[in-house]
A protein has these predicted regions:
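Substrate-binding cleft of extracellular glycoside hydrolase catalytic domains
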Residues: 91, 96-207
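Aromatic-rich peripheral "rim/lid" segments of glycoside hydrolase catalytic domains that contact
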Residues: 29-42, 316-337, 341-428
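Conserved, mostly hydrophobic/aromatic
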Residues: 86, 166, 240, 305-307, ...
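Acidic-and-aromatic substrate-binding clefts and catalytic sites of carbohydrate-active enzymes
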Residues: 63-66, 87-101, 127-130, 142-145, ...
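Catalytic domains of carbohydrate-active enzymes, especially glycoside hydrolases
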Residues: 70-94
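Boundary/entry segment of secreted carbohydrate-active catalytic domains
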Residues: 25-74
Length: 428
């Protein structure tokens, strides 16, 4: 199958934007110290400050933490492609990843005063008995939550020029998170706690507080989520961080994924291209649904995307025997069309994610959760950013001593051999 001109223009155009931004910083940014410290209010919604979710784990277990030199290696790669704010997820003492990311950025800033990278610092929230052999109690919180929040406060105060946002919980209110979800009042309690610290001068007044959760948890889906505590939470946060995954819904809510009858005559590639156009419309609708509800509660509140992404390997629901959503071509279309939309509309999108992380489904190497990255664990650039490799954006950079190269050796025809037309007719 051949690349059509529209696809070439989309992928090349977005890559040129990133390339020009990166080369501008390479040519001019290295000579001057940053003239002002950016705030969350100035970063969010700013297309010059692209966002991404980041985990630097290289191995199949988080017990093997990436070193600070390895984190610096990754952060330089992300900086080169125009990323300026990273999202992390937890600050548990046995998992010092986030603290090490902050230290890595701090060191890079000392080495080069023009270096600019910020962090949305996540604090993990659990219910009682989460991740144990006991039945989770979703109406009672874990006694570890308060400690987690306090650790986040310590890091925000230690690195005030880097930490610009604290997110209380990750998908901590959505009911399909059956291992650990809590009720909205728990999130509200800690958001209010952090806001009070800001008022009392114990945290920067410019630090923004949010919670990052599924679109439904923010009132964009099932009306049963629309409770008083959620209304109060919407008023309490500085902005709403919502997650939206057309990729997963290709299996769980596939009405948009099915090839319409009036498109059955199209070529396979045209069917595939149209499927991603529908996926983008699905994403936009979830954003609109959240926005409509949130603004009915607080018209001043902004909504940004805390997570969305597209996996490139799956031996499960989304692979060849399932919805067939999974491959680098579809990831490329989704990523680039998504960035085009969010940049135009002033929506920050913490794209999920930077690098593949194989600890997420350690017993299943081809499980989709391991393969959401724009880069492989070896540092190979996937199809969405092949053009950045062509343009020399990553020249001189490496991951684990591997230079940044393209997946499939850059062979488009070989890649396309694995790209399948969307499927909804399979046993579920």
């Amino acid at each position: 199958m051949k690349l059509n001109l529209k696809t070439i223009a989309l992928i090349t155009g977005f890559s040129i934007v990133l390339a020009c931004t990166s080369h501008h910083h390479k040519k001019t940014g290295m000579k001057h110290q940053i003239s002002k410290q950016m705030t969350a209010a100035e970063i969010l919604g700013n297309p010059n400050y692209l966002a991404i979710s980041y985990g630097g784990y290289r191995e199949q277990s988080r017990s093997i933490q990436p070193s600070i030199p390895q984190l610096k290696e990754d952060i330089k790669i992300l900086y080169a492609m125009g990323i300026r704010i990273l999202r992390t997820y937890n600050v548990q003492p046995e998992l010092p990843h986030a603290a090490n990311v902050l230290e890595a950025i701090s060191q890079l800033k000392k080495e080069d005063p023009s270096f600019e990278m910020y962090v949305m610092l996540g604090a993990w929230i659990d219910c009682l008995h989460a991740w144990t052999d006991k039945t989770p109690n979703h109406d009672v919180e874990s006694d570890q939550n308060e400690k987690e929040i306090k650790r986040a406060v310590v890091l925000a105060n230690k690195y005030p020029s880097i930490v610009k946002i604290i997110a209380v919980g990750n998908e901590a209110m959505v009911r399909w998170a059956t291992s650990y979800y809590v009720q909205p009042n728990v999130i509200l309690k800690y958001v209010n706690y952090l806001q009070n610290l800001k008022k009392n001068g114990e945290l920067s007044k410019d630090l923004w507080i949010t919670s990052s959760d599924d679109f439904s948890s923010w009132g964009g889906g099932d009306f049963s989520y629309r409770v008083q505590d959620l209304e109060d939470l919407i008023k309490a946060v500085d902005y709403v961080s919502m997650h939206t995954y057309a990729y997963h819904n290709s299996h769980y809510n596939p009405s948009f994924w099915k090839v319409p009858d009036d498109q059955l005559h199209l070529s396979d590639k045209q069917k595939i291209d149209r499927s991603i156009e529908r996926a983008i419309e699905f994403t936009k609708k979830q954003y609109r649904d959240v926005s409509e509800y949130v603004k009915s509660i607080d018209s001043s509140k902004t909504i940004h995307i805390g997570e969305t992404g597209w996996a490139t390997t799956s031996n499960g629901f989304y692979g060849a025997n399932g919805s067939r959503a999974t491959d680098e071509y579809k990831q490329g279309l989704y990523h680039n069309q998504l960035r085009e939309w969010t940049n135009k509309e002033g929506i920050s999108c913490f794209y999920f994610e930077a690098f593949d992380e194989h600890w997420k489904d350690a017993q299943n190497a081809n499980g989709s959760e391991n393969h959401f990255g724009l880069f492989t664990t070896k540092g190979e650039a996937k199809f969405p950013i092949w053009n950045l490799v062509d343009r020399g954006i990553f020249e001189g950079l490496s991951r684990n001593q591997h230079p940044i190269t393209k997946t499939y050796d850059g062979d488009y025809e070989t890649l396309m051999e694995e790209v399948l037309v969307p499927n909804t007719e399979y046993d579920r």
